[in-house]
Curated annotation (Swiss-Prot):
Originating organism: Chromobacterium violaceum (strain ATCC 12472 / DSM 30191 / JCM 1249 / CCUG 213 / NBRC 12614 / NCIMB 9131 / NCTC 9757 / MK)
Gene Ontology cellular component annotations, sorted alphabetically: cytoplasm; small ribosomal subunit
Protein name per its UniProtKB record: Small ribosomal subunit protein bS16
Matches recorded under NCBIfam families: S16
GO terms, biological process: translation
Alphabetical keyword list: Ribonucleoprotein, Ribosomal protein
Gene3D superfamilies noted in UniProt: 3.30.1320.10
InterPro entries reported in the protein's UniProt record: Ribosomal_bS16 (IPR000307), Ribosomal_bS16_CS (IPR020592), Ribosomal_bS16_dom_sf (IPR023803)
Domain of life: Bacteria
Family (UniProt): Belongs to the bacterial ribosomal protein bS16 family.
Length: 83
């Protein structure tokens, strides 16, 4: 099954997450099909906190990819509706 989920990056105590499309059997930070955005939980007011590539996100949801709970929550917070 193809899922859209967060893959952790960054440094110790400075998390940064890529929003990736991957097979559900792959490791959290392992191989992925496509990067469709990012989430920076420690962003200050000058930095962008969340960014989605909406056309690619809608494509993957349209072909059957499932959103993880955390990605669905981020989309809801941004008041964005995935197709």
């Amino acid at each position: 099954m193809v899922v859209i989920r967060l893959a952790r990056g960054g440094a110790k105590n400075r998390p940064f997450y890529n929003i990736v499309v991957t097979d559900s059997r792959n490791r959290r930070d392992g191989r992925f099909i496509e990067r469709v955005g990012f989430y920076n939980p420690v962003a200050n007011e000058k930095q962008e906190r969340v960014r989605f590539t909406m056309d690619r996100l809608n494509y993957w949801v349209g072909v059957g990819a499932q959103l993880s709970d955390s990605v669905a929550k981020l989309l809801k917070e941004q008041k964005v509706v995935a197709a």
